[in-house]
């Protein structure tokens, strides 16, 4: 008896890889099961598993006809008792439970109903009894499998034919370009696509993230459009972005939630930041106070320094701009959009844009001259972008405003021009201007690394606090 209970509970150990997310006090994401009034907090792992379960048993697993009768363990809740009886073919026991008021469509942690279990095991009598009690014939488990699909997979043709005659649907299994050959190789980040709800009215924005819900939690989702499945370049770009997002963890970098790679549509899911991006924020606020400007600058620098220090290969953003910098609920900045531009590695610290014409927008005046001109570059291209952003934060207007972006990009990248500083020098520490000029210098070798930028920004903060400048406005919330 204890062995049966242990098998039933063993599946709970896999719970960590699925479910909704919650933020802990340490600002890290952990996984928890979605809440469903009919869902038990256990996973039914006794007997045959879903036909789409990555670690299911083999369809030709033999069931011993000499297996002794087993009674229901006393410490199981009503849902698990129902599923257990379905697995053992106990029609009378099931009817007694249903007469007591148990929901015939009760599900376990994997979304499996008694009908799923009975179909897997081939218990025709149980299936008939459940259908007579109006069991949902097309209920799908967390992998998208139905009772009919399970019956077909395990070769229970009598059950399958009955379900088909009652109008059951068998979901089509469509392979994705990232489908693994061995079910045990399914990534831990894999999400159940049925738990991700994207509003149809929003449509699908090609290549862009959109707001969705995952188990009731707001998230941002990028959905791979249908035309991309036959395009190796787009699949590789999707895979590259996913690989980078999966390995980064930093307070100033967008948080990866999970992805759907074994089902269509394929999608990447990241945290949702309700306050939008820095571009919209600057349009509303204009020039920021010195304290907020420095705090934002440090947020960006710390996130970028983390990306540049990633091992074994640093992550060059190559598209750092306000639209790719998000604000979380607390007003902290997070870097996003990295991995969108594919790079060809020239050496350990040198790279080149893989397909310049396809990936580089020549109206993007945040990019460094060497990127604009399709030259070989290193990590310092991101320092140039940081300098332009820091200028806009302190000045409150885009560079060379109101000239069109295409003209501004040519002026900065081809003509080597830089905008003048219009804000009064006493409004900001003089070291800020010097740092901006170093960052956007035409010569990449003169630009500082982000570790050096952080040191300089910390010194500016310390000097301002020490000298008591801007007492009314220069207050640091982190001190």
From Swiss-Prot:
Concerning what turns on (or off) its expression, the entry says: Induced by mannitol and the pathogen-associated molecular pattern (PAMP) flg22.
Here the segments flagged for biased composition (Basic and acidic residues) are: 54-69
Q: Where is this region: Disordered?
A: 29-73
- Span of domain Protein kinase: 194-461
Localization per Swiss-Prot or TrEMBL: Cell membrane; Endoplasmic reticulum membrane
Q: How is it modified after translation?
A: Autophosphorylated at Ser-17 and Ser-26.
Can you tell me which residues bind ATP? 200-208, 222
Query: Membrane topology type, per the record?
Result: Peripheral membrane protein
In terms of InterPro entries, this protein maps to: Ankyrin_rpt, Ankyrin_rpt-contain_sf, Kinase-like_dom_sf, Prot_kinase_dom, Ser-Thr/Tyr_kinase_cat_dom, Ser/Thr_kinase_AS, Ser/Thr_Kinases-Pseudokinases
Can you quote a single GO CC term? cytoplasmic side of plasma membrane
Q: Which UniProt keywords apply?
A: ANK repeat, ATP-binding, Cell membrane, Endoplasmic reticulum, Kinase, Membrane, Nucleotide-binding, Phosphoprotein, Plant defense, Repeat, Serine/threonine-protein kinase, Stress response, Transferase
- SUPFAM superfamilies in alphabetical order: Ankyrin repeat, Protein kinase-like (PK-like)
Sites of the modification Phosphoserine?
17, 26
Query: This protein's superkingdom?
Result: Eukaryota
Active site annotation, chain numbering: 319 (proton acceptor)
Q: Look up the EC number in the record and give it.
A: 2.7.11.1
* Protein family (similarity comment): Belongs to the protein kinase superfamily. Ser/Thr protein kinase family.
Subunit architecture: Interacts with CML9 and POT5/HAK5.
Q: What does this protein do?
A: Functions as a link between plant defense pathways, stress responses and potassium homeostasis. Promotes osmotic stress sensitivity, responses to the bacterial-derived pathogen-associated molecular pattern (PAMP) flg22, and resistance to bacterial pathogens. Promotes the accumulation of POT5/HAK5, a potassium transporter that mediates high-affinity uptake during potassium deficiency.
Q: What is this protein called?
A: Integrin-linked protein kinase 1
* Species whose genome carries this gene: Arabidopsis thaliana (Mouse-ear cress)
